Every structure is written in structure tokens, then in C-alpha cells.
């Protein structure tokens, strides 16, 4: 059951009213007699492998290009793949993107590692909108309300603003559509008392109104002792065709998630050096406070107005609002003593994040001629105000030691030095005005030139609510004016194969993220600069039964913050990090019943110039590999239909070893995860699926939290689900 306090209910009231008005207005606008609609037939589809290259992606370009036409590594994980691969969360969807690894560790639950970069260097968008707090705001969300997930590798600041050196990811919600009446229901149950109930419906009301509502509830007892999770998502939208050329979509979303006694990690056996070791007896242990908690409430609202002025000119205006409230109450750090006979608990954190974003984006698309050459333009202006206040209370501890296997932990507020008080630390206000422009001109029938440019003016204002000193002034402000872009060419070797080359740039903060930045992190530094060269090819073959992509890239990020060798207490914007790699994707329908798909990436990432303070000494880490970045990541999916209505399949994921520290002295081992499923279709619209994940019950680190802890991945799970549509 969803528990909402009176205070939270008051905060939610605008959302409730918006949802009610959405459907009541739609109903009011409908005539009394609803016209007959064409019958919607839901059946199993077999699309060609080449279709993956014909999907359009607005994340990689605003020009309306297909994956094949875009001069970059672009991945589109659509609704069909989400269901076929048993993708339960937004983060699981990223396994379908070559090279990406993720972590949902509570301290950074939206962590994504892409092309050797992480944090603010990988932008995560929600319907094309960035909240500039991705490592926290992009916490995994249940996939039911999403239509697809898109990703573009490499610098892409020119599309969506500061960040995106390693790439950009876009989570796109289901919206009301004109494709007919459809209702979908799903129920599932699995290990650790995991349950899901979900429903969605798309309805035409009258001649010009279309409504959609999706609701999902997911709950489970976590595999770690004492952990319980309950999450709700609601997405509603109303599409209104005001005229044949003008339409408006109102879309709202509500998300609430509560995790009791979150799992923060497992201590590493000492001595810690070389490859890490996990005591299997502690795999399921939870050393957090007995009443530890994480809770978040998120609301989105978007108003999208689209106008087709002519066959050549289209306009689109998006007004958007986002607000989120997140609460943490946890003991977050655990370490074995020297003899591995006791675990010391420390680092108690009472934290609140209160964030709100408001903005408006006006865009245009124009298709025309430049002399005798076909040309396409897209551009616009985006203005937003992003405000966040954080309320941290941190008590280092330690809070005593416990037996690693048989223990109880005290309530959070019984710990010495902890109080139930939320005191603001600082408020960051980020005002952004951006102009952006893209063009694609076909120089010949085979050769096209693509360019993109973006200019941002970013005003950062930080108000300190606590003690003032030289490193923490009462107020400071900074202004940044990055200019970023992309220039690329594509050449069609044949109607089914092309090659491309591109150069792109990016900009992001030298350390941290601007929505939480402190004076010591930004000082008088400018944004870092990133640049990439990429060459690649996209092709289909065997009459569309097979398709593939290959890409080679080289990325350099300059002016990152590093420790000053002459003064270990300060930083200088002189560091540099680089990565170069290869990414491969492929899919092939071997027979009408058998299909294989996969991706593989190799990355060589390193610090080129990087200093780290070790006590009072400054040590160079130049040449070392960034933490939590594997050199190799691969995925393989195999699906076979042995008889009518039946389907079986398996998948394997490989991740090579990673380092836990920038000194590269501690690492985990590589790991392989195996999964399998069997499904049976009852009639044309109902599907029953049994699925297993991590079938070998591999103990592996999803994330390495320094040299004392590892955040372990989920053990073996099984689940059974039924989904129907009518």
C-alpha cells in the first residue's frame, strides 16, 4: 500500500488535479456517440533484423534521422525489446547499449559508465530533458511506463547541454497515440516475494481526443536482510487534435519509491590488495541501521504543442516542470577489522534533496533546398531554471563493531551525534539559456554533410545557509558560455551499407555537478572541454535478415580538477582523461524460428594527467585506468521458436575486471551472467513467461565503493508473469 503523509499529499495535490482534469476534460470534449474504430489485432510480430537501423531517434539528432542515417553510435531499445528481454527497469535496458555498465548503489543509484566516463560526463534525459543531477535522479525506474530507451555514444553536449562527454541516454515515456483502442494488463511474481501489477490503456474519445493512462506497482523483499521496496508509477497523457495542423499533448507522471533498510554494500576481506575477496557468509547481510530508509517522490508535467505550418515547416513548443523530494537515513560504510572477525560501521547520513526544474523549449524543423541540394534544418531555444537545496547531516562515527554473521543494528536516531533535524546546507540555482541548430545537406545521392552547434549561457548562483569561511562564502555566482558542436559526413556505399566520420565536442564541470557544486569544486574554473573523433559503418545484409554496426572512437576530456602538487588542499583545472575503443553490434535471423543478437565493446580508458592526495603527499595517477571502468563488455541474446506459440531463449553478459581505486591496486574479477526464459502465447494477445536471471548464482560486484566495500549484484532469481492485451 502506498503511504503518503499529509504534507506529501498536499505536495501531490497539483498532480492529482492535473490527472483528474486530463480525463474529465477529455470526456467532456467527446461527443455523446463515439465513432466505431478499426479493430486492433494484437499478434506476434517478426520484424527483420535490418529494422533496427530504420528506427528513428530524436536523441541522436533533432532532424528526424534513422539510426542508419545518423553519423554516431545510436541504440534504440524499443517496447518490443523491453518485453522480449524481460527488462524490468530503465537501468536494465542499458545492457542493450554496447559498452555500458551501471550501478544502483543507493549513494549513486543512477551511475552509468559509458566509453570510459561516468558521473556528470554521461547525460541521462527524461523525454529529452536533463535535470542536471543524473547520478541521483536517474535511479532505476520500473520499465512499464516507458515506450523506449535511446542512447548516443560520445560527446553530445550540442544536443542537450552541459555534460555528455561519454554519451547521452534518453528515457521516453509512453504517450497517447492515434493507433486505436488498446488495453494491456500484466501481473508477475518472483523470488524474494517480488510482485508486479500493471495496466495501461489508450483510448480515442470523440473525433479528436486520445487518452492514455499507465499505472504500475512493484514490490519485493530485497535479497539483503531486512530490505523491502515498494514503488508506484503513474503516467497519463491527453492528445488533442485541435485542427488538422495543430495538436497539443498534456503529459503528467508521478513516481513514488520507498526502500526500507536499503542495502549499501558488503565489506571486503582484509588485507585488501590485488583481487578483492568476499566472505560468502556476508553475501546477504545488511549492516545498515535497523530503520534505515530511502524514499523519493517525483512529478513531471509537460505541455507539448505541435504545429505543421506547411509540408516543409514544423514547430514544436514544450513547457516542462519537474520536482523531486528525496530522503535518506542510513549508516553507509562498513569495513572488516584486520582479523576479519568483526565489521565496523560508520558514516551515518541524514540527507534530503529538494529539487525543482521549470523550463520551455521552442523547436523548428524545416525541409528545403539549398540551390539544387536537399537540406534539412532543426533548431531552437531552451530556457530553464533548476533549483536544488540539500539538507545533509553527516556523522562519521564509528558506531562500534558487530559480529559479521550474527548481529543486530540499532535504530538510526539512537546513534551518538545524530538528530532528526533537516538543516539546509546550500541552495544551487542554475539558469540556462541555450540556442541550438542542426543541418543535414545531401551533397550527392550518396554523400551527406551533417553539422550541429549549440551555445549555452549558464548562470550558477549558490547560497550558503551554514557557517561562512574562505572556502564556503555566503554567496557566489559563476557564468559559463560553452560553445559545442558536431561536424560529420556519411557516405552510402550501397543502399544497405554506409560509412561515416564525425568530430564532436562537449563541456561539463571540472568536478562534481553544477546543481550541487560547492565553491571549492568550481572556484574560478571554466567548464572542461571534451572532443571526439569517431568513424564507423552501419549495414544490413542477406535480404534484411542480418544487420550490424561498427564504430571506432577516440575521446579526450581536458581541464578536469586535480590536486595541486604544491598545495594538496586545493585543486587545479589541469587534468586530462582519455578513452579510445571499438563497439560492435549485430543481429541475424538464422532461420524463421531462430534469431541471435549481441554487442561487444573494447575500451582503453586512462588518466593522462591526474594527481591524487594521499595523506599529505600528492601522487600522480597518470596512465592509470579510471575506477569501475571495464575494458570489455559483451552481451548475447538467442531466441528460438520451437513450435507455434512457444518461444525459448537465453542470454549471457560478460564484464571484464575493474579497479576500485585510482591507484589501480585493488580490482574485482571478470564475471559472466547467464539468463534464460520460456514463453507461451495463449491466443494472439496473451503471453505467459517464466524467466531466470543470474542462473549460476554468481557473486559479483556491480560497483566497487573504494577499497573497503563492494556493492554486490542481484543473486539468482526466477519469476513468472502473464501479460494480455485487448
Regions found by a protein language model. Give the residues of each.
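Acidic/polar loop-and-plug regions of large Gram-negative outer-membrane beta-barrel proteins
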Residues: 218-222, 235-241, 245-308, 321-355, ...
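Structural signature of Gram-negative outer-membrane beta-barrels, strongest in the C-terminal barrel
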Residues: 241-243, 355, 373-378, 382-386, ...
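Gram-negative outer-membrane beta-barrel transporters
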Residues: 446, 545, 554-556, 573-662, ...
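Outer-membrane beta-barrel translocator/receptor signature
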Residues: 144-147, 153, 158-236, 242-246, ...
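Face-selective signature of the C-terminal outer-membrane beta-barrel domain
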Residues: 299-323, 346-464, 549
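Short acidic/polar hinge/loop motifs at secondary-structure boundaries
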Residues: 102, 113, 129-153, 176
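Membrane-embedded beta-barrel scaffold of Gram-negative outer-membrane proteins
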Residues: 306-320, 324-332, 492, 498-500, ...
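Conserved C-terminal beta-signal and adjacent last beta-strands/turns
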Residues: 18, 353, 377, 624-726
Amino acid at each position: 500500500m502506498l503511504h503518503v503523509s499529509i504534507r506529501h499529499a498536499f505536495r501531490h495535490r497539483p498532480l492529482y488535479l492535473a490527472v483528474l482534469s486530463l480525463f474529465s476534460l477529455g470526456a467532456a470534449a467527446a461527443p455523446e456517440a463515439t465513432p466505431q474504430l478499426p479493430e486492433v489485432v494484437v499478434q506476434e510480430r517478426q520484424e527483420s533484423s535490418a529494422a533496427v537501423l530504420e528506427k528513428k531517434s530524436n536523441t541522436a539528432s533533432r532532424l528526424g534521422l534513422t539510426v542508419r542515417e545518423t553519423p554516431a553510435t545510436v541504440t534504440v531499445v524499443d517496447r518490443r525489446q523491453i518485453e522480449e528481454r524481460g527488462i524490468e527497469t530503465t537501468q536494465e535496458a542499458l545492457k542493450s547499449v554496447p559498452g555500458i555498465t551501471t550501478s544502483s548503489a543507493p549513494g549513486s543509484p543512477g551511475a552509468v559508465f559509458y566509453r570510459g566516463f561516468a558521473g556528470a560526463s554521461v547525460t541521462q534525459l527524461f523525454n529529452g530533458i536533463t535535470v542536471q543531477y543524473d547520478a541521483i535522479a536517474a535511479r532505476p525506474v520500473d520499465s512499464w511506463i516507458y515506450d523506449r530507451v535511446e542512447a548516443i555514444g560520445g560527446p553530445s553536449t550540442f544536443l542537450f547541454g552541459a555534460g555528455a562527454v561519454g554519451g547521452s541516454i534518453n528515457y521516453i515515456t509512453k504517450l497517447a497515440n492515434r493507433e486505436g483502442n488498446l488495453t494491456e494488463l500484466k501481473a508477475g511474481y518472483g523470488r524474494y516475494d517480488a510482485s508486479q501489477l500493471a495496466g495501461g490503456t489508450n483510448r480515442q474519445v470523440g473525433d479528436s481526443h486520445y487518452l492514455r493512462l499507465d499505472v504500475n506497482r512493484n514490490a519485493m523483499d530485497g535479497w539483503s536482510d531486512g530490505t523491502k521496496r515498494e514503488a508506484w508509477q503513474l503516467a497519463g497523457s491527453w492528445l488533442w487534435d485541435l485542427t488538422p495542423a495543430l495538436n497539443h499533448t498534456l503529459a503528467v507522471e508521478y513516481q513514488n519509491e520507498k526502500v526500507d533498510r536499503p542495502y549499501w554494500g558488503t565489506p571486503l576481506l582484509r588485507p585488501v590488495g590485488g583481487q578483492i575477496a568476499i566472505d560468502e557468509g556476508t553475501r546477504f547481510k545488511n549492516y545498515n541501521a535497523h530503520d534505515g530508509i530511502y524514499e523519493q517522490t517525483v512529478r513531471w508535467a509537460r505541455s507539448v504543442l505541435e504545429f505543421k505550418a506547411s509540408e516543409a515547416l514544423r514547430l514544436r513548443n514544450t513547457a516542462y516542470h519537474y520536482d523531486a523530494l528525496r530522503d535518506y537515513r542510513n549508516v553507509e560504510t562498513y569495513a572488516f577489522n584486520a582479523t576479519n572477525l568483526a565489521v565496523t560501521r560508520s558514516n551515518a547520513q541524514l540527507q534530503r534533496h529538494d529539487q525543482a526544474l521549470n523550463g520551455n523549449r521552442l523547436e523548428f524543423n524545416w525541409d528545403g533546398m539549398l540551390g539544387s541540394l536537399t537540406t534539412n534544418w532543426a533548431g531552437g531555444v531552451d530556457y530553464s531554471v533548476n533549483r536544488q537545496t540539500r539538507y545533509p547531516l553527516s556523522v562519521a562515527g564509528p558506531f562500534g563493531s558487530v559480529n559479521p554473521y550474527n548481529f543486530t543494528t540499532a535504530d538510526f536516531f539512537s546513534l551518538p551525534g545524530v538528530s532528526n533535524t533537516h538543516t539546509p546546507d546550500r541552495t544551487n540555482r542554475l539558469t540556462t539559456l541555450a540556442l541550438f541548430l542542426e543541418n543535414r545537406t545531401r551533397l550527392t545521392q550518396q554523400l551527406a554533410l551533417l553539422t550541429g552547434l549549440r551555445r549555452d549561457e549558464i548562470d550558477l548562483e549558490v547560497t550558503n545557509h551554514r557557517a561562512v569561511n574562505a572556502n564556503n562564502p555566503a554567496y557566489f555566482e559563476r557564468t559559463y558560455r560553452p560553445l559545442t558542436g558536431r561536424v560529420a559526413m556519411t557516405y552510402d556505399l550501397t543502399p544497405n551499407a554506409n560509412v561515416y566520420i564525425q568530430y564532436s565536442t562537449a563541456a561539463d564541470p571540472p568536478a562534481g555537478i553544477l546543481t550541487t557544486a560547492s565553491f571549492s569544486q568550481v572556484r574560478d574554473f571554466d567548464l572542461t572541454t571534451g572532443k571526439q573523433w569517431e568513424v564507423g559503418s552501419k549495414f544490413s545484409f542477406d535480404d534484411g535478415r542480418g544487420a550490424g554496426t561498427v564504430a571506432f572512437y577516440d575521446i579526450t576530456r581536458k581541464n578536469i580538477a586535480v590536486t595541486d602538487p604544491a598545495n594538496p588542499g586545493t585543486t587545479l583545472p589541469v587534468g586530462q582523461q582519455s578513452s579510445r575503443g571499438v563497439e560492435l553490434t549485430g543481429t541475424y535471423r538464422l532461420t524463421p524460428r531462430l534469431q541471435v543478437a549481441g554487442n561487444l565493446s573494447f575500451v582503453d580508458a586512462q588518466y593522462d594527467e591526474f594527481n591524487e592526495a594521499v595523506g599529505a603527499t600528492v601522487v600522480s595517477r597518470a596512465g592509470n585506468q579510471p575506477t569501475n571502468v571495464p575494458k570489455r563488455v559483451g552481451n548475447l541474446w538467442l531466441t528460438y521458436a520451437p513450435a507455434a506459440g512457444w518461444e525459448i531463449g537465453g542470454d549471457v553478459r560478460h564484464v571484464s575486471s575493474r579497479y576500485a581505486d585510482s591507484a589501480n591496486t585493488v580490482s574485482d574479477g571478470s564475471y559472466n551472467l547467464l539468463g534464460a526464459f520460456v514463453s507461451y502465447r495463449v491466443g494472439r494477445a496473451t503471453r505467459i513467461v517464466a524467466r531466470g536471471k543470474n542462473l549460476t548464482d554468481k557473486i559479483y560486484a556491480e560497483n566497487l565503493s573504494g577499497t573497503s566495500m563492494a556493492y554486490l549484484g542481484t543473486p539468482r532469481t526466477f519469476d513468472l508473469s502473464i501479460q494480455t492485451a485487448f
